[in-house]
Each structure stands twice: as structure tokens, then as C-alpha cells.
């Protein structure tokens, strides 16, 4: 009896990764086609966290809509609030006091650090390094203490308002934040010592998921995904929004375009954010923290507002104003990339159209191309380096 020669196995295996799996970043489902350990194809399936955020906006005033926007990217809620108030501010040409602008910059950069920290921990856990996952919560708790002292909430802050912020910084907060900045720089140095030159870490990320500069532009990538491919593009420098021009800081970038480059960009961005925060805290001016002119009601004061129902059951409407009949695109540099809003007003208090441009949704589109011809284990490395939050992707 002759034994047949061993032939190369040609049958492919289809594996579903997610949507309910601890290794996935939210409720993302990947349909992966494998030939052994090699990835032949990958199809992301979205929509498991879709909540109709754009349609909800068309039936709410801006103030009523603010609590919803913190549920997009729930790890960097200051940015979703910022873009939600920036769009009507630009549409109505509403001026923001200098102190309010400084407070906004401080909160935005603290939120950027918090987002990058909670990217770093799970990313390292994805590739097998468990220790940094516990380290990042040490600094993150201090950040949330600062947020809680200033806004009353550890997450979902609901702090930004049209024309300023909801409340001034409490007494002693500036000194507490400066102490955190000094402490955090030692924490970043510890991360770099622990991770950056680790040979096992380098083996997992170096040369994995390479994106060229022209390719990144063609795919519409933004944020660290774009800057890690050699493109020095940061909306804080390009659009000159808030008061970023008044601070001395540099755009962080790398030219390699791989997962290691994206890691290095985010680590460096945390250090640059600390520089911006320190300058803002030391130079924060006095004055009002909101523009009182925008807090007006559309209709005259009603005598019924002093009755029991209105005083104790809170039936007073939110202060708001009409959105003029024009269109506008506003954007900010969020931790994950360009977060934009396309707003169309029609002389009512509700937006006629509220189109969200989420960075995670755009950045995720390149995933199938990056993982093809890679190993199965590299999928989590590449997906982690993209940094997505499904609340923002699905909206």
C-alpha cells in the first residue's frame, strides 16, 4: 500500500473575532479568512453601537444635546463637547473670553492624556505585556480627580458651554494640576524605560502595519495615524483654534509609519500636552469664564415661571439661540484624529443637519489592507495601534 504524498492544505478557515470578546476594542466584529496563521482577508462589521446620534441632534437644542455627545468617544469627552459648542460659536460669531479659552485648552490636553493612557494600557495587554495596564490607572485616577474637582464628574463631564465653560476652576485646582504635571513626567519616563526598548515589544510592533505618507493621505487618515507616517499635520497648528498659538510646543511625528511609530507619537504627545498645560496654568488670565451674552432666552419671561411647578419641578427651558441659515464645518484635533462637525442651520433652535466626522471611523477603514498577508497575532497589534472607540465609530 502506497502512502499518498502530503499535499499543501488549500482549504481556508473563516474566524469571527468579536463582537463580544475581551480582546476586541468595543463591539467590533472582524470576519477573518485564514490560511493557517496567515490572514487572507479581513472584513470589519460595524453598527453594533449605533444610537442615531446625528438624528438626535436634529431634535435638540445645542444645550440639550451636550449630554449626548460625551457618549461618542467616552474616553475623551472634552473633545466631543468642544466641537459641539465650537460649531454654533463659529456660526453665530460668538466670542469666548480669554480665561475660558485657557481653561478649555487645559481640559482638552488633560483629556488627551487620559485618552492616550487608556490606549496604552490595553494596547500593551493586547500584545502580551500586562504590567503597563495596571500602571496607567495610577496616573489616570489622578487625572479623574482633577476632572471631578473642576466639573463634578469623573467621566462624561458636560463642562463646555456655548461662549465658555460651565464653572470656573475651584480654589487650589491650578496648584494641584501643576503638581500632577511634575509627577506625570516621571511616569512617562517610567513607561519609556519599561516599554520602548523592550526587545519583545519591539519584535511585536516594529515593521508591523506600515502605512506610507501618501497612502495615509489617500485614505483620509488623521491624528497619530497620519503623523506616524511622516506627515506633520496637527489642527492645533493648522486651524489656530482656541489659544494654542500662544504656547510653545512642537508637532510630534515619525516617518516609519508602523505600529512602533504610532506608539512613539502618542507617548511624545503626552509630554507635549504637559508642556501646554504648564504654560496655560502659569499664564492663565483673570476675567469671566463664560460669555454671558449668549445666555438669553428666545421668549420673554413668563409670570408662571415663579410658580411651584417651574421652581421645583424644573420646567424652565434651557438657554439657547437660533442657528442662522448657513452651513459650516468645524473641527478639532482629538486624540484619535480630526473630529469634525458639518452643521447646517435654518433659523431655528435645532440644527437642520448635524453630520459627525469621527476620526476612528475613517482610520478603521485601512485595517483590512494592513492585516492582509500578516499573521493572526498581528491583527490585535495593528488594531490596537489604530486606537478606536466604537461609540465614536458607530455613533
UniProtKB/Swiss-Prot annotation:
Catalytic activities: a plastoquinone + NADH + (n+1) H(+)(in) = a plastoquinol + NAD(+) + n H(+)(out); a plastoquinone + NADPH + (n+1) H(+)(in) = a plastoquinol + NADP(+) + n H(+)(out)
Membrane topology: Peripheral membrane protein
Superkingdom of the organism of origin: Eukaryota
rRNA processing keyword on record: no
Gene Ontology molecular function terms on file: NAD binding; oxidoreductase activity, acting on NAD(P)H, quinone or similar compound as acceptor; quinone binding
Biological process per Gene Ontology, one example term: photosynthesis, light reaction
EC assignment: 7.1.1.-
Compartments reported by the entry: Plastid, Chloroplast thylakoid membrane
Gene Ontology cellular-component terms listed: chloroplast thylakoid membrane
InterPro entries from the UniProt entry: NADH_Q_OxRdtase_suD (IPR001135), NADH_UbQ_OxRdtase_49kDa_CS (IPR014029), NDH1_su_D/H (IPR022885), NiFe-Hase_large (IPR029014)
A Pfam family this chain is assigned to: Complex1_49kDa
Keyword GTP-binding part of the UniProt annotation: no
PANTHER family registered for this protein in UniProt: NADH DEHYDROGENASE [UBIQUINONE] IRON-SULFUR PROTEIN 2, MITOCHONDRIAL (PTHR11993:SF10), NADH-UBIQUINONE OXIDOREDUCTASE 49 KDA SUBUNIT (PTHR11993)
Assembly and interaction partners: NDH is composed of at least 16 different subunits, 5 of which are encoded in the nucleus.
Family indicated by similarity: Belongs to the complex I 49 kDa subunit family.
Role this protein plays: NDH shuttles electrons from NAD(P)H:plastoquinone, via FMN and iron-sulfur (Fe-S) centers, to quinones in the photosynthetic chain and possibly in a chloroplast respiratory chain. The immediate electron acceptor for the enzyme in this species is believed to be plastoquinone. Couples the redox reaction to proton translocation, and thus conserves the redox energy in a proton gradient.
The protein's name: NAD(P)H-quinone oxidoreductase subunit H, chloroplastic
Higher taxonomy: Eukaryota, Viridiplantae, Streptophyta, Embryophyta, Tracheophyta
Amino acid at each position: 500500500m502506497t502512502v499518498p504524498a502530503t499535499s499543501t492544505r488549500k482549504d481556508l478557515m473563516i474566524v469571527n473575532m468579536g463582537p463580544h470578546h475581551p480582546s476586541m476594542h468595543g463591539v467590533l466584529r472582524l470576519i477573518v479568512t485564514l490560511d493557517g496563521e496567515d490572514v487572507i482577508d479581513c472584513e470589519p462589521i460595524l453598527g453594533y453601537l449605533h444610537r442615531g446620534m446625528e438624528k438626535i441632534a436634529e431634535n435638540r437644542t445645542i444645550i440639550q444635546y451636550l449630554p449626548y455627545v460625551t457618549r461618542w468617544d467616552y474616553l475623551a469627552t472634552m473633545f466631543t463637547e468642544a466641537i459641539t459648542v465650537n460649531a454654533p460659536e463659529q456660526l453665530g460669531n460668538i466670542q469666548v473670553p480669554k480665561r475660558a479659552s485657557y481653561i478649555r485648552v487645559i481640559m482638552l490636553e488633560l483629556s488627551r492624556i487620559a485618552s492616550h493612557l487608556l490606549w496604552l494600557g490595553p494596547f500593551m495587554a493586547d500584545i502580551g505585556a500586562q504590567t503597563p495596564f495596571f500602571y496607567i490607572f495610577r496616573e489616570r485616577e489622578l487625572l479623574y480627580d482633577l476632572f471631578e474637582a473642576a466639573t463634578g464628574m469623573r467621566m462624561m463631564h458636560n463642562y463646555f458651554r456655548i461662549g465658555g465653560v460651565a464653572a470656573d476652576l475651584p480654589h487650589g485646582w491650578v496648584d494641584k494640576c501643576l503638581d500632577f504635571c511634575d509627577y506625570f513626567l516621571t511616569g512617562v519616563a517610567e513607561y519609556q524605560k519599561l516599554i520602548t526598548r523592550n526587545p519583545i515589544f519591539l519584535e511585536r510592533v516594529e515593521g508591523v502595519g506600515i502605512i506610507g505618507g501618501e497612502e495615509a493621505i489617500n485614505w483620509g487618515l488623521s491624528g497619530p495615524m497620519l503623523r506616524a507616517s511622516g506627515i506633520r499635520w496637527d489642527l492645533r497648528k493648522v486651524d489656530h483654534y482656541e489659544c494654542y498659538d500662544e504656547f510653545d510646543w512642537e508637532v510630534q511625528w515619525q516617518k516609519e509609519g508602523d505600529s512602533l511609530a504610532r506608539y512613539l507619537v502618542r507617548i511624545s504627545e503626552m509630554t507635549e500636552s504637559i508642556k501646554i498645560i504648564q504654560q496655560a496654568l502659569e499664564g492663565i488670565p483673570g476675567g469671566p469664564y463664560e460669555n454671558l451674552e449668549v445666555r438669553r432666552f428666545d421668549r420673554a419671561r413668563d409670570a408662571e415661571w415663579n410658580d411651584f411647578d417651574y421652581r421645583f419641578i424644573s420646567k424652565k427651558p434651557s438657554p439657547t439661540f437660533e442657528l442662522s441659515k448657513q452651513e459650516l464645518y468645524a473641527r478639532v484635533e482629538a486624540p484619535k484624529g480630526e473630529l469634525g462637525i458639518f452643521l447646517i442651520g435654518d433659523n431655528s433652535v435645532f440644527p437642520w443637519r448635524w453630520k459627525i466626522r469621527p476620526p476612528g471611523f475613517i482610520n478603521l477603514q485601512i485595517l483590512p489592507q494592513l492585516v492582509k498577508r500578516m499573521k493572526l497575532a498581528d491583527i490585535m497589534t495593528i488594531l490596537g495601534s489604530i486606537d478606536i472607540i466604537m461609540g465614536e465609530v458607530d455613533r
